[in-house]
Amino acid sequence: MTVKLGFVVAEFNRDITYMMEIEAREHAGFLDAEVADTIYVPGAYDMPLAIKKLLERGEIDAVVTIGCVIEGATQHDEIVVQHAARKIIDLSLEFGKPVALGISGPGMTRMEATERIDYAKRAVESAVKMVQRLE
């Protein structure tokens, strides 16, 4: 069975999320998974609605989120990631389908974010493994 993935990709810090998306797509191909649809959103905080839209489509087996939240002068990065992660978990449970957290951050510098680009592959792997193990 080919696992059909939906990607939700944040455009904020696009220089980094673009590279994360490329890594994720390549790894999906390596795992014989298909990226059936991709929705681009402004930032990580905007992901839950796009995730819900993908999960409502019956053909999507799992969703992979791709985002990068870099530390700023305030705690904004922590708030964004905490709330996005909580809602992402809620949507996974509501729809009974895996939603892999491929959002790097909070509390990291741009350099650290660049070093963690390959974390997107881990999110793809998590999504595919969960679909296979829950069948």
UniProtKB/Swiss-Prot annotation:
The gene is ribH. The active site is at 76 (proton donor). The lineage of its organism: Archaea, Methanobacteriati, Methanobacteriota, Stenosarchaea group, Methanomicrobia. Belongs to the DMRL synthase family. This is 6,7-dimethyl-8-ribityllumazine synthase. The keyword Amino-acid biosynthesis does not apply. It comes from the Archaea. Keywords: Riboflavin biosynthesis, Transferase. The keyword Transferase applies.
